[in-house]
C-alpha cells in the first residue's frame, strides 16, 4: 500500500509562542500507512486494526499517539476538537496501544487500535489519530515538532446511506472570470466525494461549460460550497445549470437565471 502523508503540521516553538510553518519533504521524518482506514463492522462488536508508523529519518524519534475529533467546513477547511465532542465521533470507544513509543531510524511500529462499537451505532463515524514527535532542537534555537495524522472511519454498512441535494446556485462576476457558486448538502450518513460541472446557456445554446475540482470531500451531514470559475460573459441574460455527482444512483441538479451587466 502506498505510504501517504496526511495533514502534516510542523510546529516551531520559539520564544514568542507557537508558530506554524509548512515543512519540506526533507523535514518529514515520520509517515503513516494507511492515511485513511475504513473499518466495516456491526453494532456491539469489538474490532482491532493496525496503523503503521515509520521513521524515515536518520535518528530515533519519540512519538505520542492521540485521538481528535474534526469537522470539514464548506470550503474544505479542517477544524479540530477534543475527543468526544462530535456527534459522529467514536473517540471514547477507541483505545490505542501503545500510546507512546520510540522508533529507531529506518524502522517502524504497528500501533493497534481497538474500538468497542456501541450497540446502537448506525451509519458512519470518523476520527483522526495524530502521531506527534518529541520536540527536537534545530538551528536558530527553535524546537521542531512533527505531527502527522491518519483518518479513521467506522462504518455500519447495513444502516449507511448516501444522499445529497443542491440548496442554491449563484453567480458572481470577478476580475478573474465568472464564479459559479453551488451549495451542496450531504443528506446521507456517510462521507461522499464530489465531481460535476456547470453549463451556462443563452437562448438554448451552451456558451460555457466548467468542470468542478475532483474529489471534494463532504463529511456526514456536512455542506460544501463549490466555486467553479468560468470565462467572463458578455452582458446579457443566462441560465446556469449545476450538476453534482456524489456517488449516488443519479446526479443532483440546480438551476439559476442570471443577468450580466
What would you call each of these model-derived segments?
Residues 26-59, 98-100, 164-175:
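Beta-sheet-dominated interaction scaffolds and their linkers
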Residues 101-108, 215-223, 260-261:
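Short proline/glycine- and polar residue-rich coil/turn motifs
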Residues 56-59, 71, 119, 186-190, ...:
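Short, acidic/polar linear motifs in exposed loop/turn regions
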Residues 37-40, 96-103, 153, 169, ...:
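Beta-strand-rich interaction surfaces with strong enrichment in secreted/lumenal proteins
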Residues 28-34, 57-110, 195-198, 202-208:
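Surface-exposed binding patches on compact interaction domains or structured appendages
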Residues 48-52, 61-67, 91-137:
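Ligand-binding face of N-terminal immunoglobulin V-set domains in extracellular IgSF glycoproteins
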Residues 125, 129, 236-242:
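A short tyrosine-centered beta-strand micro-motif
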Residues 50-54, 114, 179-187, 229:
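Short edge beta-strand/loop segments characteristic of extracellular beta-sandwich folds
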Amino acid at each position: 500500500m502506498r505510504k501517504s502523508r496526511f495533514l502534516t503540521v510542523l510546529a516551531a516553538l520559539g520564544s514568542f509562542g507557537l508558530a506554524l510553518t509548512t515543512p519540506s519533504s526533507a523535514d518529514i521524518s515520520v509517515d503513516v500507512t494507511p492515511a485513511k482506514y475504513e473499518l466495516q463492522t456491526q453494532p456491539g462488536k469489538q474490532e482491532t486494526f493496525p496503523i503503521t508508523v515509520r521513521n524515515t529519518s536518520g535518528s530515533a524519534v519519540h512519538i505520542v499517539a492521540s485521538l481528535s475529533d474534526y469537522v470539514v467546513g464548506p470550503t474544505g477547511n479542517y477544524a479540530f476538537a477534543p475527543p468526544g465532542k462530535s456527534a459522529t465521533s467514536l473517540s471514547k470507544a477507541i483505545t490505542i496501544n501503545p500510546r507512546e513509543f520510540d522508533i529507531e531510524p529506518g524502522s517502524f511500529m504497528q500501533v493497534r487500535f481497538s474500538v468497542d462499537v456501541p450497540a446502537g451505532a448506525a451509519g458512519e463515524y470518523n476520527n483522526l489519530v495524530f502521531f506527534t514527535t518529541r520536540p527536537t532542537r534545530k538551528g536558530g534555537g527553535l524546537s521542531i515538532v512533527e505531527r502527522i495524522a491518519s483518518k479513521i472511519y467506522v462504518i455500519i454498512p447495513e444502516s449507511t446511506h448516501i444522499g445529497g441535494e443542491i440548496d442554491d446556485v449563484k453567480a458572481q462576476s470577478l476580475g478573474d472570470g465568472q464564479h459559479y457558486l453551488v451549495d451542496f448538502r450531504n443528506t446521507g450518513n456517510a462521507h461522499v466525494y464530489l465531481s460535476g460541472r456547470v453549463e451556462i446557456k443563452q437562448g438554448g445554446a451552451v456558451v460555457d461549460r466548467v468542470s468542478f475540482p475532483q474529489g471534494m470531500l463532504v463529511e456526514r451531514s456536512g455542506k460544501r460550497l463549490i466555486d467553479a470559475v468560468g470565462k467572463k460573459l458578455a452582458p446579457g441574460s443566462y441560465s446556469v445549470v449545476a450538476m453534482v455527482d456524489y456517488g449516488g444512483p443519479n446526479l443532483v441538479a440546480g438551476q439559476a437565471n442570471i443577468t450580466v451587466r
